[in-house]
A protein has these predicted regions:
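Cytoplasmic membrane-interface regions of multi-pass membrane proteins
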Residues: 71-81
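Non-catalytic, solvent-exposed segments at the cell envelope interface
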Residues: 115-116, 120-123, 128-131, 137-518
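Hydrophobic alpha-helical transmembrane segments in integral membrane proteins
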Residues: 99-117
Length: 518
């Protein structure tokens, strides 16, 4: 054998005296890489706590077996170069898979920590002037007369007013009894500026005659108060066996956080029985005319959220005679990113319709909005995020308006669940989790969510999802949040449908399959 061939032989196989060649060292490095990745994976998964005891034991055994087999091949000085190289490549592939899984586990835990924060109890109060007013800052309003609400939201109004007066002295004010009176006073030049809770802009936008209030005015100052977060709920050790009820609330506020004290445009009770794998979704029209639990006066259900998410929960508890255990608050605009990250969703519409022009987020992610109209066919529609947002918002195209919108919103929820449960999510799970982190807030403890994930991994059974949307009679009446100046569009509850919903809820809680009696 020539010297050159002997040197090449020794490089790959090692010398006859037992030194290692390149193939040996490559194999050992691959083994070390897989060993480190195995430890990281095990630490991440055990830290997440999402696996059952049986699955944890299986994972440990698999990791020990894989590392043991590769050590058996790579540790001895052998001349089987092909075997060492093949095992080394396999080890690197497995290491990459472990890194992917470890990253996914870390992203999942970060996501759970973010969404279980409960949302923000922050309240933002604005100083508003007419659009043609020369004032650009609050200091420019020296000498202005400020309009304020006499009773509604008085605590936040007084806090903002006190803050303003600390900077420029006493402010002259004029009180008004209702929100529409306050808006009229500003637009008709009875006052120069008004102090208005940020949540009331959406109320005025949805009130006939005031839809253009935001365009006719401008905000020159914002004052925020960070109120104490709601008391955390203790984890429920029996969450995977006992039924529970979640209030799913959707908000369309244009803020960079998930508010707990704003209108709720979607009101769905999710009744979940883990033992029977039954889920019942009960949708209540946003304009349902109900008594406010804390005030005794009647208002639209959507306005209940202005007084805090607990007010909405109490109202639905009274309506359906059931205890609500948790809430999940969803920011509609943020769901655009979730659906786009999923690659779109499929919804099966029972009607064909065209939406009116509505504001949707710009595609460049700038946070700005533009008007757009969409068309949907009867049957299956594949929707991107903006189309899904329009599909879930539209109500003017239907004779039964808000009731059909509620049904469409449940279709979007089902579409998201179906797509999220498919293998397609693996390609973009990080984008989905990142978008969802900014769009969802719940007071369900992280430990309870993990317990439910464990339960699902243990039996892998499917879930039976039943939906029920309530309807009512379109009418007009006074609303507490708007005052007694005029009657506003409301939906009077259909008592028979309310009774049916109550019965369906109790069926699920009793462990039965929900069935609507004819």
């Amino acid at each position: 054998m020539s010297r050159r061939r002997r040197n090449a032989y020794s490089s790959y196989y090692g010398s006859r005296g037992g030194s290692r060649g390149l193939a040996d060292w490559f194999g050992l490095l691959a083994l070390l890489c897989m060993l480190v990745c195995s430890v990281i994976l095990l630490v991440r998964v055990l830290g997440a706590g999402v696996l059952t005891t049986a699955l944890t034991v299986v994972l440990i055994l698999v990791l020990v077996l894989l590392n043991g087999l590769h050590a058996f091949v790579q540790l001895p000085v052998r001349r089987n170069v092909a075997g060492k190289l093949i095992c080394a490549v396999v080890a690197l592939v497995l290491s990459a898979a472990m890194i992917f899984t470890s990253t996914a586990a870390g992203s999942l835990m970060k996501f759970l920590s973010n969404i279980t924060s409960g949302g923000s109890a922050k309240t933002t109060t604005c100083v508003v002037v007419r659009a043609d007013d020369p004032a650009e800052t609050v200091n420019d309003t020296f000498g202005y007369t400020y309009g304020i609400l006499e009773t509604l939201d008085r605590e936040n109004t007084d806090a903002a007013l006190s803050h303003i007066e600390d900077g420029m002295g006493q402010v002259k004010t004029a009180g008004f009894g209702t929100l529409t009176q306050l808006a009229d006073a500003l637009l008709n030049r009875q006052v120069d500026a008004v102090i208005l809770n940020n949540s009331y802009f959406s109320v005025l936008k949805g009130t006939e005659g005031y839809q253009s209030f935001s365009k006719d005015t401008k905000v020159i100052y914002r004052f925020s108060i960070d109120k104490a977060d709601p008391e955390p709920i203790a984890p429920n050790a029996n969450i995977s066996r006992e039924p529970f009820v979640v209030y799913c609330s959707g908000t369309d506020e244009r803020v960079d956080y998930i508010p707990l004290n704003s209108r709720s445009d979607t009101n769905i009770l999710a009744v979940v029985n883990p033992s029977t794998h039954q889920i019942l979704l009960v949708s209540t029209p946003r304009d349902y005319y109900l008594p406010l639990p804390s005030y005794g006066q009647k208002d639209k259900l959507t306005h209940f959220g202005l007084y805090g998410i607990e007010e909405s929960i109490k109202g639905l508890e009274q309506l359906y005679n059931v205890d609500v255990n948790y809430y999940a608050r969803v920011h509609f605009a943020g769901l655009v990113g979730v659906i786009d990250a999923l690659g779109g969703i499929d919804v099966n519409s029972d009607v064909a319709f065209n939406t009116v022009g509505m504001e949707v987020p710009d595609e460049d992610g700038s946070g700005n909005f533009h008007f757009a109209a969409y068309s949907f066919q009867k049957g299956v529609n594949h929707l991107d995020g903006r189309q899904a947002l329009a599909f879930a918002r539209e109500r003017d195209a239907f004779d039964d308006g808000d009731m059909q919108r509620g049904r469409n919103q449940m279709l979007v929820v089902q579409g998201i669940v179906n797509k999220a449960a498919s293998p397609a999510i693996l390609k973009s799970y990080q984008d989905v989790l990142a978008a969802a982190s900014d769009s969802i807030a719940t007071n369900m403890p992280k430990e309870d969510i993990i317990s439910l994930v464990k339960m699902q991994l243990q039996d892998m059974s499917g879930w039976n999802i039943t939906t029920y949307g309530l309807a009512g009679e379109n009418s007009a009446d006074y609303c507490y949040s708007l005052g007694n100046d005029a009657r506003y569009a409301v939906v009077r509850p259909n008592e028979q449908m309310v009774a049916t919903a109550q019965d369906l809820i109790q069926q699920v809680l009793r462990g039965e399959t929900p069935t609507v009696n004819p």
